[in-house]
């Protein structure tokens, strides 16, 4: 479609490996292809890529841009020098670049991806067991709990997802993030709150940190909040 209209295609690559895993496991014709081969096919269609390395780069900092056309790269080079650092490092320390190179390799290992994504699926199965609503199907990096369906007694003006995030933290010290009216921010012209259709609590699962016992703990804490949801009437 982009080629038809002469539009260059940019791929946000933050979770490229997780997406490749889902292509392999869910799309017909890809079951026997390796993750790296699927990634090659994805990027064969792209003109540019952006990469936040803190996601599928499995590092704590950094990122990069990729270009198919060297002329496009040259146009951006001066901005790297002005705002980030020289072209060979772009403001990143050598240690971080080495870690990123290794992280990109490891992120495309099928066993690593399956372990990570199945841990998220395990948490989803526990929420199913407790009847806690969330966005289905579960994704690769997080569970998005449906705060609007849980905190029905909290007015939307008092931020249901943020309220659920606070209740979960008070219950068990678990930090999630609100994806709702606070994130949407106020209308720049009217200064009124903007209320999106969904009010979600995102529980993003760090890589190579937690066991399924921790997922049990998260689910049990959410159940405790869910069981007393009728008593939560304000944000």
Task: Label the predicted regions.
Residues 107, 171, 183-235:
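PLP-dependent enzyme catalytic core of the Aspartate aminotransferase-like
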Residues 148-175, 189-196:
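Active-site loop ensemble at the mouth of alpha/beta enzyme cores that anchors a bound cofactor
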Residues 1-132, 155:
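Conserved PLP-enzyme active-site core in the AAT-like
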Residues 55-56, 69-72, 105-107, 140-141, ...:
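Short, glycine-/Ser/Thr-/acidic-enriched flexible segments
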Residues 8-10, 48, 142, 176, ...:
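Structural preference for beta-strand elements that scaffold enzyme active sites
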Residues 73-74, 152-160, 208-217:
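Short, conserved charged micro-motifs
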Residues 119-121, 135-147:
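Conserved glycine-rich beta-strand-loop-beta hairpin in the small C-terminal domain of fold type I
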